[in-house]
Amino acid sequence: MYINFWYPIGLSKEVSAEQPFRVQIFGLPFVAFRDDDGEPHVLSDTCVHRGSSLGSGWVKNGRAICPYHGWEYDGDGRCTRVPSLGDSKPPARAKVDSYPVQEKYGIVFAFLGDLPAAERPPLYDVEEFGQEGWKAQTYILEVACYYQRSVENGLDPIHNEFVHPLQGAPMMTPDLQRKPLPVTQIPWGSKFFMPFGDRLNADTALASERSGENVAKAGSWHQGPNQLVTWIQFTKTDDGTITAFHQYFFEQPIDEGHTRIFFLNMRNWLMEDSLDQRVEDVTLQVVGEDIGILENLNPVRTPESNTKEVLMPGDQAVVSYRDCLKDWENRGWHVDMQALRKRQGAAAFAIPCPARRESGNWVLEAVPTLPGADEAQPPVKAVS
């Protein structure tokens, strides 16, 4: 698991100014709430007084109130009031980590890391969200799998033929399967997008709704370790529209064996409201087929070395993803989960926030990370 990237915290409707919203990421507790202006905030969910969960308390005047002794924390993570001190100022050490927040696509995201704003990898920009001619459906998927396994599944086009027989597209011909995927590097990730076979028969999902020139293309890419994109194009209509599904997966690694996926499914065809349920049924059938595989992988986590698997040319996008993970490990961003597990229960940990670069004297320990390379690789550049 990696610090210094954007992670989904909860749906916008789950984060309120009335009740704190608790969530676990990397096996660590976080709390989200809104201030009096409706702005969302995300803090480490451990009161530095005696270790209580702020998420078990309540929100008052835009502050998270600890249920144990009433300590009040503002959106910046500073304790602004200690009831037992009366009007006296709380100690300077009375603070918890507060994380940068963005609210997009009906989801609250937090940047879990300490990089300054100018150096942060971006949150993926879904340009068509909210645009005329596009429709969005959002799903929350609770999956008993490691999040990297889920991302790698999305970067694997060959499994479609075997796991999703009714999907129709994308299907790779034997000739394509023998060739390495045409993977290119993009900022903070890698990508493939290419023509595919489109095998239609009477059982193919949504086949009867397709019309126009067949221009089947599909591909997937990732941005960071936990943001996955899949585009599937079908036909070109008389007005020049390319009918497509654009699917976006924002993955929340709860722990090493559980993932909460925020799945944004967008389409520019089948736009009638009466078709929403049919599209949803087909979509969730495909999702369920993937989950059935992911929840039964051995080992649960991605192998530490590619030599522990027999990889094929069609796995090139998976290999490229793992190369990116190694680069981020070289930067010192890979959480040492073994060291963390060893000390959890004896100490309280937090993902370091940007404020730690400006001040010291923090009570919560920063999560241990694996040592980075002596010289980190430069940021991944876009391919012209």
Predicted regions and their residues:
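C-terminal catalytic domain of Rieske-type non-heme iron oxygenases
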Residues: E39, A118-S384
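Rieske [2Fe-2S] iron-sulfur-binding domain
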Residues: P8-K135, A350-S384
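Hydrophobic, proline/glycine-rich low-complexity stretches
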Residues: M1-F5
